[in-house]
């Protein structure tokens, strides 16, 4: 049996309202627990539209047929009107996710704000954004928040340092190959990172694979993964237009003896056995701009 961490990012108002219930239903059907990471502040995702001026982002939107994949309400959210606050409206749904046995962590306060501004925010602004999200999610959940995964994998050494004061069980802030302990600037070791190892739907569709090829492509990649496989889906995609495709993935995975689990299940009993590394900014296939990427020490 191959075990794979299943991470579900919830970025938007509609992804929370429509995508999460749909995913909860299909996961219950297959008796799967996963790790959900919620954005809990304003939905300003439509403000990414200015990035269409960048050829790499424009090509990503075109090859993934973004208008059909996400819907115009997501693509325009927070542009002509103030972004609606996700956690304030859907707290009961977030609690329902927790009560269904899934792991729930923080994705962001303002998903667009983090992706667009994290590189230029001051240390105080960075900490304030994370604190606001943690405070909002803490008020929603019946138990303390124990994990987080920053928006768009926009993380570096400064983000790692900022999160230390929260003493979380783990973070999932970067792309890489296996869980590791990040080296801190004082020479110590930080909170365990569990990187995402596999490509997401929007990173490869229309360029490397078609819809009809996608599930076999991902399952083959899981079986060939020589690290600790972690797969990310999005409530807006696999909980929306690609729900049937995702359900078929779960069915095929069962046939191939691939088992999905929450990311915390991938943590070793003794974190001192993990390798040491760092998170550095780097370009990444299928993405515009930089992402946090695991590097060896």
From Swiss-Prot:
Keyword match Cytoplasm: no
GO molecular function: hydrolase activity, acting on carbon-nitrogen (but not peptide) bonds, in linear amides
A GO cellular component annotation in the UniProt record: membrane
Catalysed reactions listed for this entry: 4-deoxy-4-formamido-alpha-L-arabinopyranosyl di-trans,octa-cis-undecaprenyl phosphate + H2O = 4-amino-4-deoxy-alpha-L-arabinopyranosyl di-trans,octa-cis-undecaprenyl phosphate + formate
GO BP of this protein: 4-amino-4-deoxy-alpha-L-arabinopyranosyl undecaprenyl phosphate biosynthetic process; lipid A biosynthetic process; lipopolysaccharide biosynthetic process; response to antibiotic
EC class: hydrolase
Domain of life according to the entry: Bacteria
Keyword Lipid metabolism: yes
InterPro entries: ArnD, Glyco_hydro/deAcase_b/a-brl, NODB_dom, Polysacc_deacetylase_ArnD
Keywords: Antibiotic resistance, Hydrolase, Lipid A biosynthesis, Lipid biosynthesis, Lipid metabolism, Lipopolysaccharide biosynthesis
One Pfam family per UniProt: Polysacc_deac_1
EC number: 3.5.1.n3
Pathway: Glycolipid biosynthesis; 4-amino-4-deoxy-alpha-L-arabinose undecaprenyl phosphate biosynthesis; 4-amino-4-deoxy-alpha-L-arabinose undecaprenyl phosphate from UDP-4-deoxy-4-formamido-beta-L-arabinose and undecaprenyl phosphate: step 2/2; Bacterial outer membrane biogenesis; lipopolysaccharide biosynthesis
Gene3D superfamilies: Glycoside hydrolase/deacetylase
PROSITE patterns linked: NODB
Domain NodB homology residue range list: 2-261
Similarity remark: Belongs to the polysaccharide deacetylase family. ArnD deformylase subfamily.
Role: Catalyzes the deformylation of 4-deoxy-4-formamido-L-arabinose-phosphoundecaprenol to 4-amino-4-deoxy-L-arabinose-phosphoundecaprenol. The modified arabinose is attached to lipid A and is required for resistance to polymyxin and cationic antimicrobial peptides.
Protein name in the entry: Probable 4-deoxy-4-formamido-L-arabinose-phosphoundecaprenol deformylase ArnD
Organism: Pectobacterium atrosepticum (strain SCRI 1043 / ATCC BAA-672) (Erwinia carotovora subsp. atroseptica)
Gene label: arnD
């Amino acid at each position: 049996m191959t075990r794979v961490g299943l991470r579900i990012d919830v970025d938007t108002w509609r992804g929370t309202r429509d995508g999460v219930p749909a995913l909860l239903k299909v996961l219950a059907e297959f008796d799967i627990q996963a790790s959900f990471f919620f954005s809990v502040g304003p939905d300003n995702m439509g403000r990414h539209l200015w990035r269409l001026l960048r050829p790499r982002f424009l090509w990503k939107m075109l090859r993934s047929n973004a208008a059909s994949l996400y819907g115009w309400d997501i693509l325009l959210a927070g542009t002509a009107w103030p972004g609606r606050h996700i956690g304030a409206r859907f707290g009961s749904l977030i609690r329902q996710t927790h009560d269904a046995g899934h792991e729930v962590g923080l994705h962001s306060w303002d998903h667009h704000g983090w992706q667009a501004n994290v590189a230029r925010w001051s240390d105080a602004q960075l900490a304030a954004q994370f604190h606001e999200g943690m405070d909002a999610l803490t008020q929603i959940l019946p138990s303390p928040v124990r994990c987080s995964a920053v928006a768009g994998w926009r993380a570096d050494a400064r983000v790692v340092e900022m999160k230390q004061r929260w003493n979380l069980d783990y973070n999932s802030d970067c792309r890489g190959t296996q869980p590791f302990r990040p080296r801190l600037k004082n020479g110590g070791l930080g909170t365990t990172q569990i990187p995402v190892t596999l490509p997401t739907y929007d990173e490869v569709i229309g360029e490397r694979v078609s819809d009809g090829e996608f599930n076999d492509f991902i399952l083959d990649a899981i079986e060939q993964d020589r690290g600790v496989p972690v797969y990310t889906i999005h409530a807006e995609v696999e909980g929306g237009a690609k729900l049937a495709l995702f359900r078929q993935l779960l069915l095929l995975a069962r046939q191939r003896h691939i088992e999905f689990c929450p990311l915390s299940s991938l943590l070793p009993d003794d974190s001192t056995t993990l390798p040491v590394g760092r998170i550095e900014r780097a370009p990444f296939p299928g993405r515009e701009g930089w992402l946090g990427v695991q590097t060896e020490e």
